[in-house]
Design a protein with these regions (language model features):
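Hydrophobic h-region of N-terminal signal peptides that target proteins for export
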Residues: 11-20
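Sec-dependent signal peptide recognition
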Residues: 3-11
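Intrinsic disorder/low-complexity signature
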Residues: 1-3, 350
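Active-site neighborhoods and metal-handling regions in enzymes and metal-associated proteins
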Residues: 20-484
Length: 484
């Protein structure tokens, strides 16, 4: 059987296996019980995602999906805890018959109740139901309708925000508390069912990286490589990308969140591919940086080896109970020593006068010269969101069993890197010393990102796509030989 036939067979089989890996109803009930266990007495009000604007793909909000598994728009969940007992009700809307011709007919109440294990009522009675509970003096726990990391939505009055504001206006004495921190603490520990789905997303992302490694060549457009990668996701039965795919070559490799993907790749470029499949609502996030021509240049190789060494250092620290701070510090230390050795900074502990000086008061790392070359976090949680709990890039927490997360060090040498610096004596001295080296390494951006889960015995590496220089160059060489 040819490799193409094997891949086709896998693609045909995967969607069925994905369905078998959904979260069981009992697990959703256990999640709701865990949430109400954090509440002495009160009413938890959660809002799902509304209808999308225009003809866009609809997705459920992660916290709402986590608690219900319900995948219809405009729903709300009310959990009531009093007297040591809890109950839950899902409020849904009946779709307009004409609208149903466009969007499909939603399940009836009996079907929803059977699938979710929740009592089901009509959304128009939500206000009266919560009013009666608030009038009884129960505090309200608000699970607002925005994604956890969606700061823009938090600053606007969403449907849920408007509901809570109106509730407070009607009941001035009601106590309202934020339920998101509680749900975030529950979401960070992934169950075996969640990990099965997440592994599927990661495996398909690894397959996409392997296809890209074989398919990239000089003269190819970034968007063609993006299409190759995302095609693997869809052929494998997943929803598509879990975020906007980043495919940045040459100078674009130095832009952390480059998304235009419209440059023609040239011989001698590296290309950063920061991509992830979304399968069953769970997001993978894996980055590889590869040479378009098949072999790294001397400068690219030096930067790549340094980034890989930094990633290995953080992998060694990531264990149950290990502090996030020690994890971050291990990588920063390796990068700082390596950058100093290459001459890109004056010394491993050298500082500069940054435009963000106020940040240095809370964390001195922001003022180190090494920070210029990696100003993003070292990693993040993955799950129902691509930036899921936990959030180890900040704070003083520790790793716990069940944490699924990324490690993504990088070094980026932009042609504009030194242009952002203020004209101060310290900065002038640094620029005078490092500018020739910056020019030598300019337009080289390297990021290596992998997905992991903390286990009782340590850490498991999930995303086993080629990442060592020898593996990458060997795979590219094999492709070149087969193409002859």
């Amino acid at each position: 059987m040819t490799p193409y036939c094997i891949r086709t067979l896998i693609a045909l089989l995967l969607p069925a296996s994905l369905v078998a890996q959904q979260i069981p109803r009992a697990e959703y009930a256990a999640r709701r019980d865990s949430l109400t266990a954090h509440v002495d007495s009160g009413v938890i009000v959660a809002f799902g995602a509304p209808d999308p604007v225009g003809i866009r793909r609809w997705t459920q909000l992660p916290a709402f999906r986590y608690l219900t598994g319900f995948l219809e728009p405009n729903a709300a969940l009310v959990l009531v805890k009093r007297g040591g007992r809890s109950s839950g009700t899902l409020f849904t809307v009946a779709r307009d018959p004409r609208r149903a011709l466009y969007d499909g007919f939603p399940p009836d109440s009996a079907t929803v109740a059977g699938e979710t294990g929740l009592a089901v009522r009509s959304l128009p009675v939500l206000r009266a139901a919560v009013d009666s509970l608030a009038a009884g003096g129960l505090p309200i726990y608000d699970l607002r309708d925005f994604a956890t990391a969606d700061a823009a939505s938090q600053d606007t009055l969403t449907r849920g925000g408007s509901f809570i504001a109106d509730l407070v206006a009607r009941h001035p004495g009601v106590v309202v508390r934020n339920a998101h921190p509680i749900v975030d603490s529950l979401r960070r520990r992934k169950s075996s069912a969640e990990l099965a789905i997440l592994r599927r997303a990661v495996d398909l992302t690894v397959q996409a990286h392997k296809e890209a490694l074989r398919g990239v060549k000089p003269g190819m457009w970034e968007y063609q490589l993006e299409a190759l990668i995302e095609g693997v996701f869809r052929r494998g039965g997943c929803e598509g990308p879990s975020f906007a795919s980043i495919v940045g070559s040459g100078p674009n490799s130095t832009q952390y969140h480059y998304q235009m993907n419209n440059r023609r790749m040239a011989a001698g470029d590296v290309v950063v591919m920061d991509v992830g499949a979304s399968c069953g609502g769970y997001a993978a996030d894996v980055t590889r940086t590869i040479p378009v021509s098949g072999r790294f240049t001397r400068e690219q190789r030096a930067i790549y080896q340094l980034v890989r060494q930094a990633q290995a250092a953080s992998e060694r620290v990531a264990r149950p109970g290990a502090s996030w701070q020690a994890w971050r510090d291990s990588t920063r230390a390796v990068e700082a020593r390596g950058l100093a050795r290459l001459g890109l900074i004056q010394s491993a502990d050298a500082t500069f006068d940054p435009p963000w000086a106020e940040r240095c008061r809370t964390d001195p790392v922001y003022c180190t010269q090494a920070f210029l070359y990696m100003a993003h976090g070292l990693g993040h949680g993955i799950g129902l969101e691509v930036h899921d709990p936990p959030h180890p890039w900040v704070g003083t927490g520790t790793f716990q069993v069940g944490d699924a997360f990324t490690i993504e060090p990088g070094i980026y040498v932009s042609t504009r890197l030194l242009d952002i610096l203020a004209d101060t004596p310290k900065n002038r001295a640094m620029i005078a010393q490092v500018r020739p080296v910056v020019e030598q390494y300019q337009n080289i951006g390297i990021r290596i990102e992998d997905d992991y889960v903390i286990t009782p015995n340590g850490v498991e590496w999930l995303s086993r796509a080629p990442r060592e220089i020898g593996e990458i160059e060997a795979a590219r060489l094999t492709r070149a030989v087969m193409a002859r």
